[in-house]
Swiss-Prot record:
Cytoplasmic face residues: 1-52, 111-137, 190-266
Phylogenetic placement of the source organism: Eukaryota, Metazoa, Chordata, Craniata, Vertebrata
PTM-bearing positions, type Phosphotyrosine: 213
Transmembrane regions listed in the UniProt entry: 53-73, 90-110, 138-158, 169-189
Biological source species: Rattus norvegicus
Topology, Lumenal side: 74-89, 159-168
GO molecular function list: protein homodimerization activity
Key words, A-Z: Endosome, Lysosome, Membrane, Phosphoprotein, Transmembrane, Transmembrane helix
One Gene Ontology cellular component annotation held by this UniProt entry: perinuclear region of cytoplasm
Subunit structure: Homodimer.
The name this protein goes by in its record: Transmembrane protein 192
Membrane topology field: Multi-pass membrane protein
InterPro entries: TMEM192
Gene: Tmem192
Length: 266
């Protein structure tokens, strides 16, 4: 009897402790609410519009440079001046070179812009798109810097050997045309990659690999060791995953606290 009383008292104590626990008073959150709060939100890369705009500016500049060179210099190659004074007070080659410098500055600003947004994408867990466009992001600026070097070399030679002026103009236009072709290919390839990424709206790489584990296929996961990958690439990817998981856990903890305090507020 005494044991039964103690057991009964103990059960009452347990019931009282569970009833007094404020954490157990909260109602369980519905599944759709948790899914809506904890599912990572996709942020598309906003660099496609800027890339297309810069590409249009480049095409317009090269077209104007060719028209200016043909209409202004070819009638009198030794004069280096427009008959209608379109570039007055500048000479034709000077106007073309100044336009080229402005275009290079625009590409430099664009490269900084896309580097900023790609670093943000990498911090959100999209390491694959960051690595696949790593060299492509700076390739356009490298092409324009190489074109600037070629133009500087031509101007140095022209300064020492002024004649024939028409040949130097043809070489300058050839450099601009080659630069346009290379830069066009680079920016188009970059735009296609980013458009596919934005259209697919994938989840972070960690969650995409969880899908591969949940639904096995012939696609090998990149988290583990791969014989075709270098050790540096594997370590870099593991570091990106750790940074993303730390950031994601911090956001989850914050949202859990917000959701846990909502019933108390109501």
């Amino acid at each position: 009897m005494a044991a039964g009383g103690r057991l009964e008292d103990g059960s009452l104590d347990i019931l009282q402790s569970t009833d007094d626990d404020p954490l157990l008073d909260t109602q369980p959150l519905p599944h759709h609410s948790l899914h809506a709060h904890f599912r990572p939100r996709f942020h598309p890369l906003p660099t496609v519009i800027i890339a297309n705009l810069l590409l249009l500016i480049h095409v317009v500049f090269v077209t104007l440079a060719f028209l200016t060179g043909v209409l202004c210099l070819y009638p009198d190659p030794n004069e280096d001046k427009c008959p209608e004074n379109y570039t007055n007070p500048l000479k034709v080659q000077t106007a073309i070179i100044l336009g080229k410098v402005i275009l290079w500055i625009l590409h430099l600003l664009f490269e900084r812009y896309i580097q900023y947004h790609h670093r943000k994408v990498r911090s959100r867990g999209y390491s694959q798109i960051y690595r696949s466009t790593r060299h492509l992001k700076a390739l356009a600026l490298t092409i324009h810097s190489s074109g600037n070097t070629a133009l500087l070399l031509l101007l140095c030679v022209q300064y020492s050997f002024p004649e024939p002026n028409k040949l130097y103009l043809e070489l300058i236009l050839a450099v601009l045309a080659l630069e346009l072709i290379c830069s066009l290919s680079c920016l188009v390839l970059y735009t296609v990659k980013i458009r596919r990424f934005n259209k697919a709206k994938p989840q972070p790489d960690v969650l995409e690999e969880e899908k591969c584990y949940a639904y096995p296929s012939n696609i090998a996961s990149e988290t583990g060791f791969r014989t075709v990958s270098s050790l540096e690439e594997i370590v870099e990817k593991q570091g990106d995953i750790i940074v993303y998981l730390k950031r994601h856990n911090a956001l989850l903890s914050k949202r859990l606290l917000e959701l846990a305090t909502q019933p108390a507020r109501t």
